[in-house]
Amino acid sequence: FKRSGTAVLDMVTYDMAEAVRGANHILISVQAQGFEEVFQELAPLLENGQTVSIFPDNFGSLILRRIMRDKGITTKVIIAGYDSLVYGARLVDFNNMETETDVVNITYRENEIRVDTLPSSDYEDYLRIVKEIPALDATQLVHGDTALDISISNVNPLLHIPAVVMNAGTIENWGIIP
């Protein structure tokens, strides 16, 4: 699988309302500690019929549904959570979005990825709708057992925590020890 080319974005904005108004699909990739803030702003903006896909889920689907419930929001949306990211990407050349020369390298793509919706009964509808998302066209979606299963199956804690613990001395003494 290899693609190269230029992606042209229809919109770049810091205004969440502008970004989600009329959108069919809302794809979210935020570190888990940012879910609460992002979802507090997003929840009242959601429109009937939209899908929200969270990469990786890390309990994000549960958090978004809780916020919607607490705010009394009854908008009919499908919320899906993925166990990881579909692509590994790094910004290589950044010009503060002022020119057309920003460069992103995508270094890997998942061949298959686990996903479920909350509630799980929305999964079949989600599968039909998600075919419209070009970023997922080459990735096989595997149905997870539940949103909870998806959230606890992310491999990041297994990969990153041991590395941090093994480097704790270096991290704590960064800049002190020559």
What function would you assign to each model-found segment?
Residues 16-17, 35, 123:
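Residues at or immediately preceding the N-termini of alpha-helices
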Residues 24, 30-32:
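Short glycine-/small-residue-rich Rossmann-like dinucleotide-binding loops
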Residues 86-178:
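Substrate/ligand-engaging "lid" and interaction regions
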Residues 1-23:
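Conserved N-terminal Rossmann-fold NAD(P) cofactor-binding segment
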Residues 19-22, 46-47, 108-109:
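Flexible, charged surface loops at secondary-structure boundaries
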Residues 13, 80, 142:
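General small-molecule cofactor/ligand-binding pocket signal
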Residues 24-25, 51:
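Structural motif
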Residues 32-99:
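Rossmann-like NAD(P)(H) cofactor-binding subdomain of soluble oxidoreductases
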